[in-house]
């Protein structure tokens, strides 16, 4: 599976007047923004993180959204999707009404992703497109938030080339959305509030969940791994874990509300709890507590092999509502490339980890992420990635061609692998990925699987669609009233990436055993 397949599941430059001196934008960054710095970021400490449990919207903002609508377009990962749920919750507490028609919105937010240059280009293109709506409705507020906002080069570009944008804010101050909106309504200049501070943990933020079947729950924020290709440690800040009692309470509330599946989110969930100074409590402890809650399925993303410990494996082996699917990004099968990437593990370490997981959970499905064409990658090193994929027997993968991200150490490396070589390697890798995915799904032909029905198929309204515990897509015909329920389906046909089945029955509601 390539990036295009992954994303499928989900510029107007203003002329400058020559007779005026160029505006000095540095003032925007003196207090609220610091450019990404690997050296400075690695020095960041723990003492600045504070926990706030008393979030509420001040009375001064009451009625702000009366007779006004909002629209949020989200780019990128599940973390961004969850941030959108929070912002939608804040909007609705302010009295705004959501709309799906962007040109009719009174406030438009682009919640951005900085992981790849292609994602950023889409945002700039959308900003140019929004200008025509702004001209028709000068009262429309346009805002840019999310990871791109944490990059100084991006904010500078918006300030210079997209003056119709009204507000820019970062990932650390979503809770200040009411203040930012108020200032945008009152100000004649673009409101820029991007904190270089690494962020606190804000509890009790309102949320407008995007669905009623599956829910995302943040367990931590940020990342301290500093892989040389990745911008996330700069845009999301240092690792900071939510307190376990807050997470457990949220999951209990979701279970009581009828949710069937919880996805625990973090840039590196396996580092959960490492920053606690008063308790010894890691991801394995959290999963052990959550498995006792009466909710059918719990899964997590994203894992880092370096922090995947034996206790977590031991807990996952207890199964119950802990699913048998682990997404474990390896990125490369070459020790030399892993070292350049600063992944801090070796091929041998990764294979030993996989061996432990498979020994404890024989039915486990493993999926991964892989980058090809990294600086200095040789044909032999790429072949090592192919051999590792076969040795592990991954059942699916998100595959990418390397592209440099400004502000990362890798961007300073010579990108010396020709583009045609990168594309050829990606094609060869995807052939292997497709082969192993097809074989894995073919083994299910004739088997009965448990499916959480999420709705109708994207292609046919008379076909239902859902996912197995191992996150495999299943399409089948059945009664619409089973949407939102767990059902048993017999597999009758397979493709490289999905299954077709025959509806059998609804799964009986069984209490989760402790």
UniProtKB/Swiss-Prot annotation:
Monomer. This is tRNA-2-methylthio-N(6)-dimethylallyladenosine synthase. SUPFAM superfamilies: Radical SAM enzymes (SSF102114). [4Fe-4S] cluster 1 binds at residues 77, 113, 147. Residues 1-24 are annotated as: Disordered. Transmembrane segments: none annotated. PANTHER family: CDK5 REGULATORY SUBUNIT-ASSOCIATED PROTEIN 1 (PTHR43020), MITOCHONDRIAL TRNA METHYLTHIOTRANSFERASE CDK5RAP1 (PTHR43020:SF2). Catalyzes the methylthiolation of N6-(dimethylallyl)adenosine (i(6)A), leading to the formation of 2-methylthio-N6-(dimethylallyl)adenosine (ms(2)i(6)A) at position 37 in tRNAs that read codons beginning with uridine. Binds 2 [4Fe-4S] clusters. One cluster is coordinated with 3 cysteines and an exchangeable S-adenosyl-L-methionine. Residues 15-24 have a biased composition (Basic and acidic residues). Gene3D superfamilies: Methylthiotransferase, N-terminal domain (3.40.50.12160), tm_1862 like domain (3.80.30.20). [4Fe-4S] cluster 2 binds at residues 223, 227, 230. It catalyses: N(6)-dimethylallyladenosine(37) in tRNA + (sulfur carrier)-SH + AH2 + 2 S-adenosyl-L-methionine = 2-methylsulfanyl-N(6)-dimethylallyladenosine(37) in tRNA + (sulfur carrier)-H + 5'-deoxyadenosine + L-methionine + A + S-adenosyl-L-homocysteine + 2 H(+). The lineage of its organism: Bacteria, Bacillati, Bacillota, Bacilli, Bacillales.
């Amino acid at each position: 599976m390539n990036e295009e397949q992954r994303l499928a599941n989900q510029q107007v430059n203003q002329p400058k007047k020559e007779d005026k001196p160029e505006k000095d934008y540095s003032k925007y960054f003196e207090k609220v923004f610091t450019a990404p710095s690997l050296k400075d970021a690695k020095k960041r400490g723990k003492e600045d993180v504070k926990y706030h449990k008393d979030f509420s919207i001040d009375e001064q903002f009451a009625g702000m959204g009366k007779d006004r609508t909002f629209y949020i377009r989200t780019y990128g990962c599940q973390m961004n999707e969850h941030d959108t749920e929070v912002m939608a919750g804040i909007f609705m507490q302010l009295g705004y009404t959501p709309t799906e028609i962007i040109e009719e919105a009174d406030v438009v937010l682009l919640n951005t992703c900085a992981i790849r240059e292609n994602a950023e280009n889409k945002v700039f293109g959308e900003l140019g497109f929004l200008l025509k709506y702004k001209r028709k409705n000068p009262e429309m507020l346009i805002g840019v938030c999310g990871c791109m906002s944490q990059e100084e080069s991006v904010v500078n570009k918006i300030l210079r080339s997209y003056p119709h944008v009204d507000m820019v804010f970062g990932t650390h101050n979503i809770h200040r959305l009411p203040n930012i909106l108020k200032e945008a309504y009152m100000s004649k200049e673009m409101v820029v509030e991007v904190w270089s501070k690494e962020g606190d943990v804000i509890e009790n933020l309102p949320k407008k969940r995007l669905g009623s079947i599956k829910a995302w729950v943040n367990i931590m924020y940020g990342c301290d791994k500093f892989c040389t290709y990745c911008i996330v440690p700069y845009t999301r800040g240092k690792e900071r874990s939510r307190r376990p009692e807050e997470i457990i309470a949220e999951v209990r509330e979701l279970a009581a509300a009828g949710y069937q599946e919880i996805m625990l989110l973090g840039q590196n969930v396996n580092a959960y709890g490492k920053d606690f100074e008063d308790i010894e409590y890691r991801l394995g402890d959290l999963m052990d507590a959550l498995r006792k809650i009466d909710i059918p399925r719990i899964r997590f993303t994203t894992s880092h092999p370096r922090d995947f410990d034996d206790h977590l494996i031991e807990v996952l082996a207890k199964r119950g509502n802990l699913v048998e699917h682990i997404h474990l990004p390896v990125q490369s099968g070459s020790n030399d490339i892993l070292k350049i990437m600063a992944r801090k593990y070796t091929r041998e370490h990764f294979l030993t980890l996989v061996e432990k997981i498979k020994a404890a959970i024989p039915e486990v499905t493993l999926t991964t992420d892989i980058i090809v064409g990294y600086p200095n990658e040789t044909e032999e090193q790429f072949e090592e990635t192919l051999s590792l994929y076969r040795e592990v027997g991954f059942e699916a993968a998100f595959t990418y061609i390397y592209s440099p991200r400004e502000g990362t150490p890798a961007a300073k490396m010579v990108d010396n692998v020709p583009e045609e070589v990168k594309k050829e390697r990606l094609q060869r890798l995807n052939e292997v990925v497709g082969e192993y995915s097809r074989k894995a799904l073919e083994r299910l032909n004739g088997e009965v699987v448990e499916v959480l029905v999420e709705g109708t198929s994207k292609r046919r309204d008379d076909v239902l669609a859902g996912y197995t515990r191992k996150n495999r897509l299943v399409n089948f015909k059945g009664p619409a009233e089973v949407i939102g329920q767990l059902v048993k389906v017999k597999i009758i046909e397979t493709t490289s990436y999905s299954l077709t089945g025959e509806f059998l029955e609804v799964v009986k509601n069984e209490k989760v055993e402790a």
